[in-house]
Amino acid sequence: MPSLKDLAKECGVSVATVSKALNDQPDIAAATRERIRVAARRMGYLPNAAARALKTNRTYNLGVLFVDERQSGLTHEYFSAVLDSFKVEAEKRGYDITFINHNISGRSMTYLEHCHYRSVDGVVIACVNFYDPQVVELVNSDVPVVTIDHVFNNRMAVLSDNVAGLKALVKQAWACGHRRIAFIHGEKTSVTENRIAGFYQACEELGLEIPEEYVRDGVYHDVERCAEETRALLALPQRPTCIIFPDDFSALGGYNALAEAGLSIPDDISVMGYDGIYLSRVVNPSLVTYQQNTAALGQTAADKLIELIEHPRVTLPEQLRVSGRLLSGRSVRSL
C-alpha cells in the first residue's frame, strides 16, 4: 500500500502539502488539492486510521439513528435508498458508519450514551419518533446532528420538499379534469403536516372546495389501514374521482379496496401515490406518483454532517429542501 511519502513523490509536492490536501486544510490551492486526491484514489492510498484519529481528534465514524417502529426496517425502500446514498457519500469522504441503538451486548443505554460509547463524530437521524425524550436529549447534546425530514431549532436539517410534492400531485389531477380530489395522509408528523399544507395550498390556488371527509387519517406503509379509508371514501354520497395515498406501498390498499368494490383504475376512479419507489412502476396500472430524490437527500445529509464535524466554527445550521419530480403512470385518467 502506498505511503504518504509515495503520494508526495508522485505529485511532486511535499509530504506536508499532501497532508493538507487530504485533511481539507484551507491554505492550499483547490487545483492542487484535487490533483492530490485524484492521485490518491488512483494509487489506492488509504490513511492509517489510528494516526489520522490521533492527529485530527476524530474517529471518522458517523452514527446513524434509524428506528422503524412499523418494522419495515431497511426494507422500507425510501429510507433504505436515502441511507444507502448517505453511506456512499460518507465512505467517499473517508468515514465509516455505525447504527445507533439501545443495546450493546445486552446492556441497555440511551442513544446519547451509545454515541459516546462508539465515539462517533456526528449522527444523522431519520425515521424515528422525533419527540422521544432520548432523541431530544441527543439533539440537544454537543454531538453534531443532521436530521432528515424533521426540523429542530438551531440544528441542521435536510428535508424533502413535501409541500411542493403534494401541490404537484393536486395540480396534475386538476389538469386531468378532477375536481373531487381526496387525500389519505399518514400519521401526524412534520412530514404529514407539510403534505397537508401542500394539499390545501394547491386547492386554494385552484379554487377547489374540498369536503372535510375527503381528507382522511391513514398510516404510512399500512396497506390495510389505507384500504379501510378507501372504503370510507367510496361510501360517501358523492365519492371522489381521484384519491392521493400516503405513499406508493400503502396505495396497494387502495388498489385492493377498489378491486373488491368492482371498480377499475383509472376508468372508474383515479389513484396517486407518493415516493416514486420501484413498486409504483410495476403495479398494474402503473402509479402516478411523486418521486423523492433519495440520492440527493442522503448525499446532502452526509455533506452537511461532515461540514459540521470538520468546520464547526463556520458551518451554520440551516434547513435544506430537496426537490423531487412527478412520475407519470396510467392510474389517472382525464375527465
Protein language model features and the residues they cover:
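Alpha-helical recognition/docking segments in bacterial nutrient-uptake
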Residues: 2, 61-171, 175, 235
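Bacterial carbohydrate/catabolite-sensing allosteric modules
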Residues: 1, 10, 42, 85-93, ...
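Short gly/ser/thr-rich secondary-structure transition/capping motifs
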Residues: 42-48, 104-108, 127-128, 255
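Short, cationic motifs built from Arg/Lys/His that form the positively charged side of catalytic pockets
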Residues: 19-20, 33, 119, 195, ...
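Conserved acidic
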Residues: 24, 28, 50, 74, ...
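Short amphipathic alpha-helical segment that frequently serves as the phosphate-/nucleotide-binding helix
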Residues: 33, 79-83, 196
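N-terminal helix-turn-helix DNA-binding module of bacterial transcription factors
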Residues: 1-60
